[in-house]
Amino acid sequence: MSDLTSPSITAVRDLREASCGPIGAPAVTSDLSENVILTSLDDLHNWARLSSLWPLLYGTACCFIEFAALLGSRFDFDRFGLVPRSSPRQADLLIVAGTVTMKMAPALVRLYEQMPEPKYVIAMGACTITGGMFSADSTTAVRGVDKLIPVDLYMPGCPPRPEAIFDAVIKLRKKVGDESLAERRKHVQTHRYFTVSHQMKRVEEQVTGSYLRAETQKAALAAAPAGQTLATDAAVLTPALEAVES
């Protein structure tokens, strides 16, 4: 029979008495280091924007029906701080859901231009991204909305599920959180909209195609420039039976 005064039982009793007692009031400190939160202007600005995205819903086909399911209580669309707006001047997120035709293209571009900066675009569904099934034989469907306006996030599917829309919103929030106020100067006007000016650098070609112009692989090895290493095994140095067309 175990001893009732063992240290383990005593510790359990002390813990029970301490947990059943009244909770003491936390000590309020006046130390400045414990009452100040240090952050940057970029983090504060991005936190305010990513927590209150106001989307403009541009639905033209069946993908918009899946988006309408988010407005119900099952998926709780409002928990991300998204407030649908009916005016492009009050929105900073444009969600294009459905097929875009040549006739609707000017209206879509006009809505995008009326949105204030900074603004973002989500392409929802296969018809919005590539034209979908209408791109095969239709002469009026736009083969990708990115030919009209810049797209920040592509959401494939026919149609995408409501969970995919949540995933797209979360990824867009991460993108907004990584932005900097200093990078706004990189946005320049190209064509009819503002986008990031990509600085492309031309690099040296790695595949020159000399092996296609040589009659044999031995000739290609002899014609190789100085410093370029080629395979020198027996299979490579065997002359080809047929001449390679240039």
UniProtKB/Swiss-Prot annotation:
InterPro entries membership: NADH_UbQ_OxRdtase-like_20kDa, NADH_UQ_OxRdtase_20Kd_su
Keyword Secreted part of the UniProt annotation: no
Catalytic activity: a plastoquinone + NADH + (n+1) H(+)(in) = a plastoquinol + NAD(+) + n H(+)(out); a plastoquinone + NADPH + (n+1) H(+)(in) = a plastoquinol + NADP(+) + n H(+)(out)
Keywords from the named record: 4Fe-4S, Iron, Iron-sulfur, Membrane, Metal-binding, NAD, NADP, Plastoquinone, Quinone, Thylakoid, Translocase, Transport
Gene Ontology BP terms: aerobic respiration; electron transport coupled proton transport; photosynthesis, light reaction
Topology class, membrane: Peripheral membrane protein
Binding site for [4Fe-4S] cluster: C62, C63, C127, C158
Disulfide linkage: none
Cofactor note: Binds 1 [4Fe-4S] cluster.
Domain of life (superkingdom): Bacteria
PANTHER family: NADH DEHYDROGENASE (PTHR11995), NADH DEHYDROGENASE [UBIQUINONE] IRON-SULFUR PROTEIN 7, MITOCHONDRIAL (PTHR11995:SF14)
Function: NDH-1 shuttles electrons from an unknown electron donor, via FMN and iron-sulfur (Fe-S) centers, to quinones in the respiratory and/or the photosynthetic chain. The immediate electron acceptor for the enzyme in this species is believed to be plastoquinone. Couples the redox reaction to proton translocation, and thus conserves the redox energy in a proton gradient. Cyanobacterial NDH-1 also plays a role in inorganic carbon-concentration.
Protein's recorded name: NAD(P)H-quinone oxidoreductase subunit K
Originating organism: Parasynechococcus marenigrum (strain WH8102)
